Swiss-Prot record:
Catalytic reaction equation(s): GTP + H2O = GDP + phosphate + H(+)
Protein name: Elongation factor 4
Molecular function as annotated in GO: GTP binding; GTPase activity; ribosome binding
Gene name as annotated: lepA
Biological processes, Gene Ontology terms: positive regulation of translation; translation
PANTHER family: TRANSLATION FACTOR GUF1 HOMOLOG, CHLOROPLASTIC, TRANSLATION FACTOR GUF1-RELATED
The species this protein was found in: Cyanothece sp. (strain PCC 7425 / ATCC 29141)
Residues holding GTP: D19, H20, G21, K22, S23, T24, N136, K137, I138, D139
Physiological role: Required for accurate and efficient protein synthesis under certain stress conditions. May act as a fidelity factor of the translation reaction, by catalyzing a one-codon backward translocation of tRNAs on improperly translocated ribosomes. Back-translocation proceeds from a post-translocation (POST) complex to a pre-translocation (PRE) complex, thus giving elongation factor G a second chance to translocate the tRNAs correctly. Binds to ribosomes in a GTP-dependent manner.
Family (UniProt): Belongs to the TRAFAC class translation factor GTPase superfamily. Classic translation factor GTPase family. LepA subfamily.
InterPro entries listed in its UniProt record: EF-4, EFG_III/V, EFG_V-like, EFTu-like_2, G_TR_CS, GUFP, LepA_C_sf, LepA_CTD
Length: 603
């Protein structure tokens, strides 16, 4: 490894919207600097999980150290710190930006600026990063670099006269990008003599070494064998292994201010070394931790149940293993009368939920039932403390509570002008409050709405994409809780409430949702030997009901002619039997019924 003085280190990240070519650009940089040998090169080199490759998104952060000889003949060390581009992971993005001094803003020359790019650029500006605009995919026939340059200048206010024209796929403009990193990104501050402070920007669990922590040294020096303390959790560890990532791990003896590396210190779980925590020496600790640390707060909750009750322990183990790698995932055991034993899980957002679900099914071969996602409500009871609930079935009765508040988010949608009407209609049907509308360019518009988070977690994103033919993009952030007339909608099957189908809905929408739910269930629950009523109720008031008629055997088949009383006797006997059955019989609710409830909101 080249030893580099602080003045020749450059730490940068790449900001880009999904599909604008960030991973391909990272591949080219690794190749051009000779960090990864040509024969080892594969597409999306830094995206390690199969899921990341398949969806073409970056989920976990990666880092890579590149040695680069500049045109001035000096040897530089460039540290690329990768960021996830999706809104669910914005805290991780802010931590990895805090570890950098500069950022490449990669924009697709045929598409222009998207909502998530904007959100991340603002984050980068908050951290005072030097931003270098790069127009990617200029080899495409539909590329309009001049229009996109103007768009970046108008929307973000960045001077684009020096923007690099590039095509990561064809390898055009890569040399210019490397030179502009060296000349424009400022070197880290030279604080080698101060007490050690290092920022954790990612960590993952390795079955042999425990948790491996990726960090950037902000002040001071760290050596192999040092005893370190994590300032937020207060725990102390001895460093077993210290090294740099070129993307493969290479051990080194020490790292100083400005450098990026990894360490292993027999840490048991990722929750002990959280993203954003500060590492310092146990013997000579720093006075204050680095700013900006936050606990990850789940926003979306759902129940996960194994379809086969015997798999409950397997599900517990799988969640424990995922939790080792994913500090934002929360779960606790839960039982449901309809589904048996399972877990109530909390996620950062919908994408995070889908990814966890997919990893459980794919990597651990589990068959899962997922209940409808819900958000965290704040309930003020008549007596006692305010408390939070994430499961609709635990909501207290109206006579015991004063008010319910739900979380609201501010949503920014960037869309071509043609789709403004249909997206405004979508936001209004989801109880959105219109706040602002800005024209970014004559063709592109930003719509700003305030919406309840509960209206977004189901399928708002999919609806927005389908209404705008895939051209709109969105970004949201929490703005606090607001009181609304919310009610708990219970679904009763054969007079028994099914807890997994309960939902908290707005009073004005309760009838529509209840009616749709019962008619859907009527189609899906198979007929039994007795009549099954299906009802949607608020408290004790039934607002919608359907019934599934009983299957009947033709008991009169053996009577040809004969007396009517004989027939009546047989029919009465059948009726009495059905009545007895209804009292003791239990109704089988098939798996599809629960899935249909999830899909119901899409229709």
């Amino acid at each position: 490894m080249t030893e580099a003085p602080v003045s020749r280190i450059r730490n940068f990240s790449i900001i880009a919207h999904i599909d604008h070519g960030k991973s391909t650009l990272a591949d080219r940089l690794l190749q051009t600097t000779g960090t990864v040998a040509a024969r080892d090169m594969k597409e999306q080199f830094l995206d390690n999980m199969d899921l990341e490759r398949e969806r073409g998104i970056t989920i976990k952060l990666q880092a890579a150290r590149m040695n680069y000889r500049g045109e001035d003949g000096e040897e530089y060390v460039l540290n690329l710190i990768d960021t996830p581009g999706h809104v669910d992971f914005s805290y991780e993005v802010s931590r990895s930006l805090a570890a950098c001094e500069g950022a490449l803003l990669v924009v697709d020359a045929s598409q222009g600026v998207e909502a998530q790019t904007l959100a991340n650029v603002y984050l980068a500006l908050e951290h005072n990063l030097e931003i270098i605009p790069v127009l990617n995919k200029i080899d495409l026939p539909g590329a309009e670099p001049e229009r996109v340059k103007q768009e970046i200048e108008e929307i973000i206010g960045l001077d684009c006269s020096g923007a690099v024209m590039a095509s990561a796929k064809e390898g055009i403009g890569i040399a210019e990008i490397l030179e502009s990193i060296v000349h424009l990104v400022p070197p880290p501050q030279d604080t080698v003599s101060e007490p050690l402070r290092a920022l954790i920007f990612d960590s993952y669990y390795d079955p042999y070494r425990g948790v491996v922590v990726y960090f950037r040294v902000m002040d001071g020096t760290v050596k192999q064998g040092d005893k370190i303390r994590l300032m937020a959790s207060g725990k102390e560890y001895q460093i077993d292994e210290l090294g740099v990532l070129s993307p493969a791990q290479v051990q080194v003896k020490e790292l100083h201010a400005g450098e990026v590396g990894y360490l292993a210190a027999a840490i048991k779980a990722v929750t002990d070394a959280r993203v954003g925590d500060t590492i310092t020496l146990a013997t000579a600790p720093a006075k204050t931790p680095l700013p900006g640390y936050e606990e990850a707060k789940p926003m979306v909750f759902c129940g996960m149940f194994p379809t086969d009750a015997d798999q409950f322990e397997d599900l517990r183990e799988a969640l424990e293993k995922l939790r080792l790698n994913d500090a934002a995932l929360q779960y606790e055991p839960e039982t449901s009368s309809a589904m048996g034993f399972g877990f109530r899980c909390g996620f950062l957002g919908l994408l995070h939920m889908e990814i966890v679900q997919e990893r459980l099914e794919r990597e651990y071969n589990l068959d899962l039932i997922i209940t409808a996602p819900s958000v965290v409500y704040r309930v003020t009871p008549l007596k006692g403390e305010v408390f939070m609930i994430d499961n609709p079935s635990t909501l207290p009765d109206p006579q015991h509570r004063e008010k319910i508040e739900e979380p609201y988010v501010q949503v920014e949608m960037i869309t071509p002008e043609t789709y403004v009407g249909t997206l405004m209609e979508l936001a209004q049907t989801r109880r959105g409050v219109f706040k602002d509308m800005k024209y970014l360019t004559p063709e592109r518009t930003t719509l700003i709405y305030e919406l309840p988070l509960a209206e977004i977690v189901t399928d708002f994103f999919d609806q927005m994409k389908s209404r705008s033919r895939g051209y709109a993009s969105m970004e949201y952030q929490l703005i606090g809780y607001r009181e609304n007339p919310l009610v708990k909608l219970d679904i009763l099957i054969n007079s028994d409430p099914v807890d997994s189908l309960a939902a908290i809905v707005h009073r004005d929408k309760a009838y529509g949702v209840g009616r749709a739910l019962v008619s859907k269930l009527r189609e899906l629950i198979p007929r039994h030997q007795f009549k099954i009523p299906i009802q949607a109720a608020i408290g004790s008031k039934v607002i919608a009901s359907e019934s599934i008629p009983a299957l009947r055997k033709d008991v009169l088949a053996k009577c040809y002619g004969g007396d009517i009383t004989r027939k009546k006797k047989l029919l009465e006997k059948q009726k009495a039997g059905k009545k007895r059955m209804k009292a003791v019989g239990s109704v089988d609710v098939p798996q599809e019924a629960f899935m249909a409830v999830l899909r119901l909101k899409d229709e």
